[in-house]
A protein has these predicted regions:
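Conserved, mostly hydrophobic/aromatic
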Residues: 41, 53, 83, 122, ...
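Structured C-terminal cap/extension of enzyme domains
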Residues: 257-260, 281-417, 422-434
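N-terminal binding-site loop/beta-alpha segment at the start of enzyme catalytic domains
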Residues: 2-121, 130
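Beta-strand-rich modules
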Residues: 461-479
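Active-site mouth loops of central-metabolism enzymes
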Residues: 54-65, 126, 136-152, 316-324
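Extracellular fibronectin type III
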Residues: 477-489
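Recognizes extended acidic, P/S/T-rich segments that occur
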Residues: 435-465
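Glycine/proline-rich, positively charged
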Residues: 142-270, 287-294
Length: 489
């Protein structure tokens, strides 16, 4: 049987996506698809396919005429190896569990396919910020779960294992694990403070502590928290996810002195730069730490098309078509995957079809066959222009509004034998940050190149000659400037 070359496959599917005529009756089987492209998943080292299967769309909000299990099985058959779900995605984990039984992925059962299990990367999420029950209600600290919202992170973790590998009632077989747990949907700085309790502060087993030190126990098989008395190793990696607040996500990464965070799931699409964007803010920080980076919200949760620009409420909000003639889906996927630092993109599937030219999964698969530098800057700008007026540019309801280039944060001054000026990163607007200028008594005395600030160690400039006043200015690659307040020496 002839296997379609990548070029043949892309040309054929591109024609269909553009609404052009394809020979009547032409079909190609899944065994004719070119092998999926992969990228090294940051410091995790796993060779991840550029397309991952998202656990929402019809896996969460299942239309009456859709069975989610064949969607998962088809993704496996096509060679997709990254799978995403969450404890907030309704029955999504249960659907994965049904598919895993058909694929012999249940440890301890006859025919368990350990090789297949090792070939995939399975991620779930917890929106619990605390490790165990009995936590205070704090402003801007949300603890949500479709299971027990008051149960803490361990309850969520074991719920995931039970739903995907066990009986769905809290039990799971020995040998069960998830490749990664992400802290779900980081929105506020206050949540970061809670999640680092027990790391930045001593562990007090009589009190509560954050999700990170808790998950670390179940990654390493330790029992520092007292929550893992069997010394189970149930997860292999820990990460974070977020769509709203790049500064909070930067803070989460910077505070990780223990190298706990291996990956980040982040919203990225062609309208990103209309908002407080991620591609020039948190993504470079995660990339500088060699984290695995997963793209989501490639189609703005469907708002690039016919869906309302708000959180999906039910199956009526699930998109079940492949792009439109006016706005093909392929360039939007290519945009996300050519954003510097991105390794894979998870995309939810509304439906699959026997006609591969109309199948969301197949069409997303071919669109994801793009190299990291596969689009020119000009082409990326053209894609941005094609979407900037969709819903008047208000597609990314899940993202903080545009605020422009900011001054450096937390500027301070110390005097001893010399003057030392310290500051934290500015936040970029449309263009990446370039450098910082230091002014003494209104005159330029130094420049400091911007680098992603990967820790809480600040930028520093030392001045041997003492002046009366100092100011630090952030400058982006277009020459835009933002001045911090003047400090008196």
């Amino acid at each position: 049987m002839h296997t379609l070359s990548r070029r043949e496959f892309v040309k054929l599917s591109a024609a269909a996506a553009a609404g052009l005529t394809v020979l009547p009756g032409f079909r190609f089987g899944l065994d004719q698809l070119p092998a999926p492209m992969t990228r090294t998943f940051g410091k995790i080292g796993f060779e991840v396919t550029t397309l991952g299967l998202g656990g929402q769309a019809s896996l969460q909000w299942t239309p009456p005429d859709v069975d989610p299990v064949p969607i998962i099985l088809k993704a496996f058959k096509m060679g997709v190896n990254y799978f995403d779900t969450s404890n907030l995605y309704d029955a999504s984990q249960l659907h994965f569990g049904k598919a895993f039984r058909k694929l012999n992925l249940i440890p301890g059962e006859e025919g368990y396919d350990e090789k297949l299990r090792e070939s995939i990367f399975l991620t779930t999420k917890t929106h619990q910020r605390w490790g165990k029950p009995g936590f205070p209600e704090l402003e801007n600290v949300n603890n949500w779960s479709n299971g027990d919202p008051a149960g803490g992170a361990v309850v969520d973790l074991k719920r995931s294992l039970s739903q995907m590998f066990g009986d769905g009632n809290g039990n799971y077989p020995e040998g069960s694990y998830v490749n990664m747990v992400l802290t779900h949907n980081l929105n506020f700085q206050e949540e970061v403070d809670v999640m680092y309790k027990g790391l930045e502060t001593p562990i007090n087993k009589d009190e509560n502590f954050g999700v990170l030190v808790t998950l670390r126990d179940f990654r390493d098989g330790t029992n520092l928290t007292g929550l893992n008395p069997k010394n189970e190793k149930l997860i292999r990696h820990i990460g974070l996810s977020g769509h709203i607040n790049s500064p909070a996500m930067i803070n989460m990464i910077q505070r990780d002195r223990w190298e706990i965070l291996d990956a980040m799931l982040v919203a990225i699409n062609s309208n990103d730069r209309l908002y407080l964007n991620h591609q020039h803010n948190v993504i470079p920080v995660a990339q500088a730490k060699n984290m695995g980076i997963i793209a989501m919200k490639v189609f703005s949760d469907g708002a690039m098309y016919s869906k309302y620009a708000n959180w999906t409420r039910d199956h009526e909000g699930v998109i079940r078509t492949v792009g439109t003639r006016e706005l093909p889906s392929k360039p939007l996927i290519e945009y996300a995957l050519t954003t510097a630092g991105i390794h894979t993109a998870i995309i939810g599937i509304g439906q699959i079809a026997d006609d591969n030219l109309k199948c969301q999964l197949v069409q997303n698969y071919y669109a994801a066959q793009v190299k990291p530098g596969g689009l020119s800057i000009k082409r990326r700008q053209e894609i941005e222009e094609s979407t900037r007026m969709v819903k008047d540019g208000k597609t990314n309801y899940f993202q903080l509004p545009f605020q422009g280039l900011t001054p450096p944060q937390n500027v301070s001054l110390k005097q001893k034998d010399q003057v030392e000026i310290h500051w934290d990163t500015a936040y970029a607007a449309n263009t990446p940050l370039s450098h910082y200028e230091v002014l003494r008594d209104g005159k330029l005395v130094g420049k400091v190149k911007h680098e992603p600030q990967v820790s809480r160690d600040p930028f520093t400039f030392a001045d041997q000659e003492k002046g009366k006043s100092y100011r630090v200015v952030s400058v982006d690659q277009d020459g835009n400037r933002a001045e911090a307040e003047e400090l008196q020496a």
